[in-house]
């Protein structure tokens, strides 16, 4: 989607900048997009307060930096359009999840800081550098869970690189550090004919999948320190 903003207040005597054209793209390069988070008022503020000089003298690096500073802008490219225009191509962040309680993760697995009150999964990791790994694993976990129509509410990656998932039902799945996708797939494979029966009254509180030939479950009313085991020696 192309937006054009006229600039009546920017009138240097020679080569005045009269128009800014905004093109919105997504991560695949598609340009048939609309602004979702950035407002026209924010763009006009940049045009009237951040762009210095005329069509020829304005510093394109400074203009790009002004757009990048907008909280929801992930990337921006600017170029002159003869004789009095400026073309700006922007890509907005697309929020995938909350990162803890103070930031967001976009679909690239990048952490950015914007405050929103939206229901999104929560990612927790030992450091921001791990956000991309958590985002990638979220996609894999979601595909595995799709057959039983359960969504992820929270993913926790510990400093020891152990994985834990909380589902939208409230059930916590302990996956450990090894064979995490195999363990989750095993949970899905037995869900309909085994685990779902235990879920008839209330969702399970906890399922420990770190056993090579079984798993342990905790019912909501059971004391947390005494899980009921289905067999096997717990792995890591």
Regions found by a protein language model. Give the residues of each.
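Charged, solvent-exposed interaction patches on well-folded alpha/beta domains
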Residues: 1-54, 58-69, 75-236
């Amino acid at each position: 989607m192309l937006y054009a903003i006229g600039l009546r207040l920017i009138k240097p005597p020679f080569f005045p900048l009269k128009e800014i054209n905004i093109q919105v793209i997504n991560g695949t390069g598609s340009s048939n997009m609309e602004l979702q988070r950035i407002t026209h008022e924010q763009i006009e503020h940049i045009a009237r307060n951040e762009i210095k000089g005329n069509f020829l003298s304005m510093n394109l690096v400074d203009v790009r930096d002004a757009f990048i500073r907008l909280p929801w802008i992930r990337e921006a490219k600017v170029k002159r359009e003869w004789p009095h225009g400026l073309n700006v191509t922007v890509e907005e962040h697309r929020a995938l999840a909350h990162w803890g309680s103070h930031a967001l993760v976009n679909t690239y697995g990048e952490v950015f800081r914007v405050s929103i009150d939206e229901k999104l999964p929560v990612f927790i990791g030992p450091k921001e550098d791990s956000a991309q790994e958590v985002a990638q694993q979220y996609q894999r976990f979601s595909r595995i869970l799709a057959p039983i129509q359960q969504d992820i509410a929270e993913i926790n990656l510990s400093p020891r690189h152990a994985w834990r998932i909380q589902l939208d039902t409230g059930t916590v799945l302990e996956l450990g550090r090894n064979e995490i996708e195999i363990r989750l797939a095993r949970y899905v494979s037995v869900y309909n004919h085994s685990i779902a029966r235990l879920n008839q009254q209330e969702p399970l509180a906890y399922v420990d999948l770190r056993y090579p030939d079984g798993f342990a479950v905790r019912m909501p009313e059971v004391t947390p320190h005494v899980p009921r085991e289905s067999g096997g020696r717990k792995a890591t």
